[in-house]
């Protein structure tokens, strides 16, 4: 049973301002990784980050994963696309092992129903999964799954390696290409009264240029 799970791509993006002013930018520590700018800004709430890390640590021997949802947006000032990940849906009924994760037909039905019933106004932004003891990269199977089930240019993937506490995002280039070895950081949406909580050892905070942005989430 196969279900195409990227069904909301025809929906127009939310027109709003990107929330740079409440975000902490995280970039790879590897200088070579930083040579290419992020193709599309990805903002992530602290709650979403914590939930994915908790799921990643729930099974250190086998791959686990799920969906990421939130809002697909277009900056009302600059016209550039960006996404805000604020909802995490851990996958159920998967087939998994130390080096593989399969979203079965039952997985896709359960996740899709959960998204529609509980978060009808949210967009399916992509998926996340772990690579226990293997590092942060995209395998051939990961690439096939991403291209076939998350084909929209604004849909992204997150890979977490829980043993080393490292992770990174895989984001398509404007021409649609996807480098299986090059990952990107993200913008952590922070609480005004506290700092960042990202603890991955392969990312570091970056100073952010004045990006002249205002409010976003409540649009």
Which sequence ranges carry the predicted segments?
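Conserved beta-strand-loop surface patch within small alpha/beta domains used
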Residues: 1-124, 133-219
């Amino acid at each position: 049973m196969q279900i195409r799970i990227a069904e909301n791509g025809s929906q127009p993006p939310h027109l709003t301002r990107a929330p740079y002013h409440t975000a902490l930018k995280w970039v790879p520590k590897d200088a070579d990784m930083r040579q290419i700018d992020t193709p599309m800004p990805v903002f992530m709430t602290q709650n979403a980050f914590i939930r994915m890390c908790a799921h990643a640590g729930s099974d250190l021997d086998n791959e686990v994963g799920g969906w990421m949802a939130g809002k697909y947006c277009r900056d009302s000032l600059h016209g550039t696309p960006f996404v805000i990940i604020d909802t995490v849906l851990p996958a159920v009924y998967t087939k998994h092992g130390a080096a593989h994760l399969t979203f079965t037909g039952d997985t896709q039905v359960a996740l899709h129903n959960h998204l529609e019933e509980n978060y009808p106004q949210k967009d399916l932004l992509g998926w996340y999964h772990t690579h226990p003891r293997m590092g942060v990269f995209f395998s051939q199977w990961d690439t096939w799954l991403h291209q076939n089930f998350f084909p929209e240019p604004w849909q992204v993937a997150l890979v977490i390696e829980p043993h080393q506490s490292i992770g990174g995002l895989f984001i398509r280039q404007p021409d649609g290409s996807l480098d299986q070895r090059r990952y990107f950081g993200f913008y952590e949406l922070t609480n005004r009264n506290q700092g960042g909580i990202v603890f991955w050892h392969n990312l570091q905070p970056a100073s952010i240029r004045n990006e002249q942005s205002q409010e976003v989430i409540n649009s």
